[in-house]
C-alpha cells in the first residue's frame, strides 16, 4: 500500500503491515518475527540459526546483527556543524588509535528478530535488545552501486577459491 511505500517509511511499519496480513491469511497469531533484509545477501543459514539461538537463550525482546566497523566514532568519524568539525562521539579520554577506542559495531541490517510486543513498541534498541556479531565479509548491506560491486567481487572470489556459499 502507498502509506507504507517509499524511503521515508520505517522497516518496522512495513513489518507490522506484513504481520497483520500474514495473520489474516494464515488465521494465526505470530509471537516472533524474523526479518531477513534482502539487501544483505551474504548472510548464510548458520548466521540465521546462531542469531535465533541467541535470541532464544537471552530472552531478549529483539535482536539485531552487526559487525566490527571500519571507523570508530570516538576516533575517526567527524560531523560538521556550522562549519565546525568535531569527533562524532565525544569523550573525556583522548583516543589515539581506533584499536584502543571503545569497542563499537556497525549495524548490518542483515537479521532482525522481534517479539511481537517489541515490534509494536516502536523502538529498535531497548534495554532488552540483544546483538549478534557477524563477520564483515557477510555484513555488506547493498545501499549503493559500490556495495553491489563489493558483493559481486566477494562472490566471484568465493567461486574462484571453490568456497561454497550457503545463502
Q: Where do the model's predicted regions map?
A:
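Conserved N-terminal catalytic core of the sugar/cofactor nucleotidyltransferase
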Residues: 1-29
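Hydrophobic helical membrane-anchoring modules
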Residues: 132-133, 138-167
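Short beta-strand-to-loop acidic/aromatic patch adjacent to the donor-nucleotide binding site
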Residues: 27-41
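Glycine-rich "substrate-gating" loop/helix at the edge of Rossmann-like oxidoreductase active sites
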Residues: 2-5, 38-40, 136-138
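Short, high-confidence coil segments that cap the C-terminus of an alpha-helix
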Residues: 28-30, 57-61, 158
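Conserved core of the sugar-phosphate nucleotidyltransferase
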Residues: 7, 11-13, 17, 41-129, ...
